[in-house]
Amino acid sequence: MARKLKAPNSDFELTERALAPFLDRIILGDCLEILPQMPSSCVDMVFFDPPYFLQLPPKRLIRWRVRTVVEGVNDAWDKFSSFDEYDLFLRRTLEEVRRVMKPNATIWAIGTYHNIFRIGTILQDLGFWILNDIIWVKANPMPNWLNVRFTNATETLIWAVRDKAAKNYMFDAKAAKAIDNARIALNVWRIPLCRGKERLKDEAGRKLHSTQKPEALLERVICVSSKPGDIILDPMAGTGTTGYVAKKLGRRFIMIEKVEKYVEAAVKRLEGLQICATSI
């Protein structure tokens, strides 16, 4: 006997049903193909960690004193033919990201001097309202082996709300002040790059992902700007740090990643948390 389905009685129920295939999953696919399949106004916070577009030369960088290879960011996913192509990629992605954000949702966009100014401009062009910039000071940065410029020891996070008119976005002032046990919440965070057991490696012992973010960074971001039960989106999730930390902190999450080996590593990393990878 066929079971009669109960019709949803609210927009919330409709959204919940449409969102079910995405929740608490790392989805193997291109975010520009997956995001349009998601319902509008459904996520509470976004962590946006796009390619840096470093434009590195094809030659290998060698540490001149010890003659070893520098493991920089020279992956295929970081290559674009021009600034125009890169900007179009950012704009198209952020348009879809903004659509799936709730009106009071916030986004954390991270980058280096190579791309963060372009990201900030596009965020403003699309109607996001910037709340803060956070300077992440790396306690253990990669030295500048060529001795031609200062060692780049920071990255910038732009924290923005979807709409300027939103006054009820989530900000946990107590959690913010707990950072470094400060009386006031400062926008400078000193956190080391991930290392040791936290840094995922391939079979040859090399870094699996060149820009894996430390869990401590995501813990601060998620604690300050979301509450338990909130839905966190990471459209370019890499090896799954955002979902891993979100799950530990009692949040729901949606992760998208197009590189299969990263998805496989994320699934293995999160097996104890009952995460599954799917391809839509």
Task: List the model feature ranges, each with a label.
Residues 1-264, 275:
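Core catalytic lobe of class I
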Residues 265-280:
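PRPP-dependent phosphoribosyltransferase catalytic core
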